[in-house]
Amino acid sequence: MNPPPPPSSGHWFESDPLWFKKAVFYEIHLRGFFDGNADGSGDFRGLTEKLDYLEWLGIDCIWLLPMYASPLRDGGYDIADYYQVHPDYGTIDDVKTFIEASHERGLRVIADLVMNHTSSDHPWFQRARQAPAGSAERDWYVWSDTNQKYEEARIIFTDTESSNWTWDDVAGAYYWHRFFSHQPDLNFDNRDVQEGMLDVLRFWLDLGLDGFRLDAVPYLFEREGTNSENLPETHDFLKRV
C-alpha cells in the first residue's frame, strides 16, 4: 500500500523508496505548536502558516502525533473516529490544505496511527458491547466470559491497571485491553477488522499522507501460551499494510 509521491521539488528522497531511513523528521504535537485561529490550541491552520519556517530548518518530513477525533484521555492515542480530526485542530479540509502546502515545499508528512485499540467511545465499540454474543458486530473486539485467558501477557500499565481484562455490564462479558481500560483492543483475528483498518490507511493515503508510524502493533493478536506480543500473525498482517 504505497502513497503517491509528492510533486517533484528536487529533494533527494523523491526517487528513493527507502527515503525514511535517511530523512530528518520533525515531530509535532499539534495542540502545542501554533494557534492559527486564536482559540488557545495549536491547529492545522497554524501549522500551515509555519511551513516556511519548517522548510528553513532543513527537515525532510513532518511527523504528526495523533490528530484524530478523540476524548483525549490518552493524548489522542484513544481514537474515537479514524476518519475525522479533533475539532480543536481543524477540519479534514484544513488537513488537505496543510498536506498540499507541505508537498509544494518538498516536505513529506506522516502521522501516528493506533491500530491495536480504539477509545471505548468509538462507535465500533459501542456497537460491539450492545450486540449479541457471537454476532458480527460483537466480534470486532476481544471478549471473554472469564478474565483468566492469556495470563502470560504482561500488564503494561501496572500503576493503573490490575488486569488486561475489564468487565462490561452492557455486554455482560470481559473485554481485552493491553493499555488502559478505556482503550479496548480490536480483534485482528476478524478479517473485517483487518479490512476496516486497511480502509483507514487508504483514506489517509488518498488524502495525501506519505506514511504512518504504526503505534502499538506488537499487540495485535493474542494466543494462549505466549506473551501475545510480536506474534507471527502480526507480521503476516503488517505485510499487507
Which residues are covered by each model-predicted region?
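Acidic/aromatic-lined carbohydrate-recognition and catalytic surfaces
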Residues: 2-190, 194-198, 206, 217-241
